[in-house]
Amino acid sequence: MKFSIITVVKNDKINIESTINSLLRQNFSDYEHIIVDGNSSDGTSEIITRAIRNKKKIIYIRKKDKNLYQALNRGIKIAKGDYVGILHSGDKYFNDKVLELVNTKISNKIDILSGFLIYADNDLNKKRIWNYKIKNLSPYSAFKIAHPTTFISKKIFKKIGYYNILYTIASDTDFLLRVSKIPNISFTLLQRPLIIMRIGGLSTSFSKIFRKIYEDFKIYFVNFKYLFILQYVRKILYKIRFN
């Protein structure tokens, strides 16, 4: 089994090296690391270039994108792995055995796998954990999934397409809802932490919260019509647990 791990970055020279090293420390080695850089100008690209000289597993794309999701799509389209994982700049794996663990639990019959997400401060001190239980993936349970922890079969993208770049901050919500509607979708949950995410990312910053609410409302209305308020309230009440 081969993984394609995608990192999107722009002007994050402080954190990008620790993210790269988190992947390099993994015990499991059958992966490629695709870094999509939105034309960083702060020295990020020099750090990535230095890492490439030392390790040949990195595929580097440097190009201006409209948003995070267009950058993710660029990476997914060139990915050669069986499964696509995400490791945003500033984030890291919970330990050096995450990919090894995922490899033992996943198979070509599984469409999507996810686990728990740890929120941390800038010094990576644990603040809270996004843990949950899902037996069957459906439009009514998809909101529980911690998107940064997902490993998604490349076949899924070929089946339903990529992230919708019209959404600038909540396209993962739209994507997971589309995935959940696939007939007989095969989902596996690992009830343990996979990713440590620094608080202050695209959708965890207070300055972005209203945009997130607007896009979520739009996505939920498209998917649930007049029941969207009820389903959206369920999501909000669920997320309050982790704040």
What are these regions (language model features)?
Residues 193, 205-229:
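Catalytic core of nucleotide-sugar-dependent glycosyltransferases
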